Amino acid sequence: DPFRPQMLGEGGLGLASAGAVIDAREAHFAAVREMFETCTVFIFTLGLTEAWLTEDGMALPVPPGVLGVTEGASAASFHNFGLSEIYQDLEEVLADICIVNPQLRVIFTVSPVALAATFEPRHVMISNTLSKATLRLAAEMMRERHARVCYFPSYEIVTAPVNAPGAFEADLRSVSPLGVAQVMALFNRHMLSGGEAAAAAPAAMPAPSLNATASPLSDEERAAYDARARIICEEDLLATGPGP
Protein backbone atom coordinates (compact mmCIF):
# COMPACT_ATOMS: atom_id res chain seq x y z
CA ASP A 1 0.00 0.00 0.00
CA PRO A 2 1.75 3.21 -1.12
CA PHE A 3 0.03 5.09 1.70
CA ARG A 4 2.00 2.99 4.19
CA PRO A 5 5.60 3.76 3.18
CA GLN A 6 7.19 1.86 6.05
CA MET A 7 5.63 -1.33 4.71
CA LEU A 8 7.46 -1.04 1.39
CA GLY A 9 10.98 -0.77 0.08
CA GLU A 10 14.30 -1.87 1.49
CA GLY A 11 14.44 -1.26 5.22
CA GLY A 12 10.94 0.19 5.21
CA LEU A 13 12.14 3.38 3.50
CA GLY A 14 9.54 3.46 0.75
CA LEU A 15 9.76 2.77 -2.97
CA ALA A 16 12.45 4.26 -5.17
CA SER A 17 10.37 5.74 -8.00
CA ALA A 18 6.90 6.84 -9.05
CA GLY A 19 6.74 3.86 -11.42
CA ALA A 20 7.43 1.46 -8.57
CA VAL A 21 4.66 3.10 -6.57
CA ILE A 22 2.20 2.66 -9.46
CA ASP A 23 3.15 -1.01 -9.81
CA ALA A 24 2.77 -1.57 -6.07
CA ARG A 25 -0.57 0.23 -6.14
CA GLU A 26 -1.93 -2.04 -8.86
CA ALA A 27 -0.77 -5.16 -7.02
CA HIS A 28 -2.26 -3.85 -3.79
CA PHE A 29 -5.63 -3.05 -5.36
CA ALA A 30 -5.74 -6.46 -7.03
CA ALA A 31 -5.18 -8.14 -3.67
CA VAL A 32 -7.87 -5.99 -2.04
CA ARG A 33 -10.35 -6.82 -4.82
CA GLU A 34 -9.64 -10.54 -4.48
CA MET A 35 -10.06 -10.36 -0.71
CA PHE A 36 -13.44 -8.65 -0.87
CA GLU A 37 -14.70 -10.88 -3.68
CA THR A 38 -13.77 -14.16 -2.01
CA CYS A 39 -13.93 -13.70 1.77
CA THR A 40 -16.93 -14.91 3.76
CA VAL A 41 -16.30 -12.81 6.89
CA PHE A 42 -14.53 -9.45 7.02
CA ILE A 43 -13.19 -8.27 10.40
CA PHE A 44 -13.14 -4.47 10.48
CA THR A 45 -11.18 -2.96 13.39
CA LEU A 46 -11.76 0.73 14.13
CA GLY A 47 -8.76 2.45 15.68
CA LEU A 48 -8.85 6.24 15.96
CA THR A 49 -10.65 9.30 14.63
CA GLU A 50 -7.84 11.83 14.16
CA ALA A 51 -6.30 12.05 10.70
CA TRP A 52 -4.16 14.16 8.41
CA LEU A 53 -5.60 14.75 4.94
CA THR A 54 -3.94 15.86 1.73
CA GLU A 55 -5.45 18.60 -0.40
CA ASP A 56 -7.27 16.02 -2.52
CA GLY A 57 -8.76 14.29 0.53
CA MET A 58 -6.40 11.34 0.89
CA ALA A 59 -5.62 10.25 4.46
CA LEU A 60 -1.99 9.88 5.56
CA PRO A 61 -1.04 6.98 7.86
CA VAL A 62 0.92 9.26 10.21
CA PRO A 63 1.17 13.05 10.69
CA PRO A 64 3.40 14.92 8.23
CA GLY A 65 7.09 14.78 9.08
CA VAL A 66 6.92 11.81 11.45
CA LEU A 67 8.75 9.60 8.96
CA GLY A 68 11.34 12.30 8.34
CA VAL A 69 9.78 13.38 5.04
CA THR A 70 8.97 17.08 5.04
CA GLU A 71 8.15 17.54 1.34
CA GLY A 72 4.49 18.48 1.00
CA ALA A 73 3.95 18.37 4.75
CA SER A 74 2.57 21.90 4.91
CA ALA A 75 -0.20 20.97 2.45
CA ALA A 76 -1.70 18.35 4.78
CA SER A 77 -4.37 19.41 7.25
CA PHE A 78 -5.63 17.95 10.50
CA HIS A 79 -9.16 16.53 10.69
CA ASN A 80 -10.92 14.76 13.54
CA PHE A 81 -13.72 12.65 12.09
CA GLY A 82 -17.06 12.92 13.85
CA LEU A 83 -19.74 10.29 14.37
CA SER A 84 -21.85 11.20 11.33
CA GLU A 85 -18.82 11.15 9.01
CA ILE A 86 -17.62 7.79 10.31
CA TYR A 87 -21.06 6.22 10.12
CA GLN A 88 -21.56 7.48 6.56
CA ASP A 89 -18.16 6.14 5.52
CA LEU A 90 -18.90 2.72 7.04
CA GLU A 91 -22.27 2.59 5.27
CA GLU A 92 -20.65 3.43 1.94
CA VAL A 93 -17.85 0.90 2.39
CA LEU A 94 -20.28 -1.86 3.33
CA ALA A 95 -22.54 -1.06 0.37
CA ASP A 96 -19.61 -1.12 -2.07
CA ILE A 97 -18.24 -4.41 -0.73
CA CYS A 98 -21.64 -6.07 -0.87
CA ILE A 99 -21.96 -5.24 -4.57
CA VAL A 100 -19.15 -7.71 -5.31
CA ASN A 101 -19.86 -10.04 -2.38
CA PRO A 102 -23.57 -10.08 -1.46
CA GLN A 103 -23.15 -12.89 1.10
CA LEU A 104 -20.39 -11.18 3.08
CA ARG A 105 -20.68 -10.92 6.86
CA VAL A 106 -18.83 -8.24 8.82
CA ILE A 107 -17.49 -8.24 12.37
CA PHE A 108 -16.72 -4.80 13.76
CA THR A 109 -14.28 -4.33 16.62
CA VAL A 110 -12.69 -1.32 18.31
CA SER A 111 -8.97 -1.41 19.04
CA PRO A 112 -8.11 -1.23 22.76
CA VAL A 113 -4.75 0.37 21.93
CA ALA A 114 -4.86 3.96 23.14
CA LEU A 115 -3.86 7.00 21.10
CA ALA A 116 -0.16 7.79 21.42
CA ALA A 117 -0.69 11.51 20.82
CA THR A 118 -3.38 14.01 19.91
CA PHE A 119 -3.36 17.19 17.85
CA GLU A 120 -6.38 18.51 19.70
CA PRO A 121 -5.62 21.15 22.39
CA ARG A 122 -6.32 18.78 25.28
CA HIS A 123 -4.79 15.82 27.10
CA VAL A 124 -4.38 12.68 25.02
CA MET A 125 -6.46 10.67 27.52
CA ILE A 126 -9.48 12.88 26.83
CA SER A 127 -8.99 12.55 23.08
CA ASN A 128 -8.61 8.80 23.44
CA THR A 129 -11.86 8.42 25.37
CA LEU A 130 -13.79 10.49 22.82
CA SER A 131 -12.21 8.66 19.88
CA LYS A 132 -13.00 5.19 21.21
CA ALA A 133 -16.52 6.18 22.26
CA THR A 134 -17.24 7.62 18.82
CA LEU A 135 -15.98 4.51 17.05
CA ARG A 136 -17.84 2.22 19.42
CA LEU A 137 -21.10 4.04 18.75
CA ALA A 138 -20.53 3.97 14.98
CA ALA A 139 -19.99 0.21 15.16
CA GLU A 140 -23.17 -0.19 17.21
CA MET A 141 -25.17 1.83 14.69
CA MET A 142 -23.97 -0.47 11.92
CA ARG A 143 -24.84 -3.55 13.97
CA GLU A 144 -28.35 -2.29 14.66
CA ARG A 145 -28.99 -1.46 11.00
CA HIS A 146 -27.53 -4.49 9.22
CA ALA A 147 -28.27 -8.16 9.90
CA ARG A 148 -24.97 -9.11 8.26
CA VAL A 149 -23.02 -7.09 10.87
CA CYS A 150 -22.09 -8.05 14.42
CA TYR A 151 -19.75 -6.60 17.03
CA PHE A 152 -16.98 -8.36 18.93
CA PRO A 153 -15.96 -6.59 22.18
CA SER A 154 -12.17 -6.77 22.00
CA TYR A 155 -12.00 -3.22 23.37
CA GLU A 156 -14.19 -4.07 26.34
CA ILE A 157 -12.38 -7.35 27.07
CA VAL A 158 -9.04 -5.58 27.45
CA THR A 159 -10.11 -2.33 29.13
CA ALA A 160 -12.95 -3.45 31.43
CA PRO A 161 -12.18 -3.01 35.16
CA VAL A 162 -13.37 -6.59 35.80
CA ASN A 163 -10.42 -7.91 33.84
CA ALA A 164 -7.30 -9.06 35.63
CA PRO A 165 -4.09 -6.97 35.62
CA GLY A 166 -1.68 -7.80 32.84
CA ALA A 167 -3.71 -6.97 29.72
CA PHE A 168 -1.40 -4.04 28.93
CA GLU A 169 2.34 -3.69 28.56
CA ALA A 170 4.39 -1.51 30.91
CA ASP A 171 3.53 1.56 28.79
CA LEU A 172 -0.16 1.00 29.73
CA ARG A 173 -1.06 1.48 26.07
CA SER A 174 0.09 -1.55 24.09
CA VAL A 175 -1.87 -4.76 24.60
CA SER A 176 0.32 -7.49 26.08
CA PRO A 177 0.59 -11.02 24.65
CA LEU A 178 -1.50 -12.12 27.63
CA GLY A 179 -4.21 -9.63 26.68
CA VAL A 180 -4.12 -10.76 23.06
CA ALA A 181 -4.40 -14.38 24.17
CA GLN A 182 -7.45 -13.56 26.27
CA VAL A 183 -9.17 -11.76 23.39
CA MET A 184 -8.44 -14.58 20.95
CA ALA A 185 -9.59 -17.26 23.39
CA LEU A 186 -12.96 -15.54 23.72
CA PHE A 187 -13.13 -14.90 19.97
CA ASN A 188 -12.53 -18.58 19.27
CA ARG A 189 -15.11 -19.62 21.84
CA HIS A 190 -17.91 -17.30 20.76
CA MET A 191 -17.25 -16.52 17.08
CA LEU A 192 -15.75 -19.75 15.73
CA SER A 193 -17.92 -22.31 17.48
CA GLY A 194 -20.13 -22.86 14.43
CA GLY A 195 -23.27 -22.62 16.53
CA GLU A 196 -26.17 -20.22 16.19
CA ALA A 197 -24.77 -18.04 18.97
CA ALA A 198 -21.42 -17.60 17.25
CA ALA A 199 -22.27 -14.19 15.81
CA ALA A 200 -23.13 -12.64 19.16
CA ALA A 201 -20.86 -11.61 22.01
CA PRO A 202 -21.53 -13.23 25.39
CA ALA A 203 -24.02 -11.49 27.64
CA ALA A 204 -21.50 -11.21 30.47
CA MET A 205 -17.77 -11.41 30.01
CA PRO A 206 -15.92 -13.70 32.43
CA ALA A 207 -13.02 -12.31 34.43
CA PRO A 208 -10.34 -14.99 34.45
CA SER A 209 -6.81 -14.26 35.51
CA LEU A 210 -4.73 -13.51 32.46
CA ASN A 211 -1.67 -14.92 34.15
CA ALA A 212 -3.52 -18.16 34.84
CA THR A 213 -4.90 -18.70 31.34
CA ALA A 214 -1.85 -18.08 29.19
CA SER A 215 1.52 -19.78 29.20
CA PRO A 216 4.64 -17.62 29.61
CA LEU A 217 6.32 -16.69 26.35
CA SER A 218 9.87 -17.73 25.60
CA ASP A 219 12.39 -15.07 24.59
CA GLU A 220 12.11 -16.22 20.96
CA GLU A 221 8.31 -16.08 21.01
CA ARG A 222 8.36 -12.63 22.58
CA ALA A 223 10.84 -11.34 19.98
CA ALA A 224 8.66 -12.72 17.17
CA TYR A 225 5.56 -11.12 18.69
CA ASP A 226 7.28 -7.74 19.07
CA ALA A 227 8.54 -7.85 15.47
CA ARG A 228 5.08 -8.61 14.13
CA ALA A 229 3.41 -6.00 16.33
CA ARG A 230 5.67 -3.28 14.95
CA ILE A 231 4.14 -3.52 11.46
CA ILE A 232 0.51 -3.37 12.55
CA CYS A 233 0.01 0.35 13.04
CA GLU A 234 2.11 3.34 11.99
CA GLU A 235 0.44 5.34 14.75
CA ASP A 236 2.95 3.66 17.08
CA LEU A 237 5.58 5.89 15.48
CA LEU A 238 4.11 8.80 17.44
CA ALA A 239 5.18 7.04 20.63
CA THR A 240 8.46 5.47 19.55
CA GLY A 241 9.69 7.41 16.53
CA PRO A 242 10.56 5.84 13.16
CA GLY A 243 12.41 2.57 13.25
CA PRO A 244 15.72 1.83 11.57
Please tell me what each predicted stretch does.
Residues D1-P244:
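Extracellular glycan-modifying ectodomains
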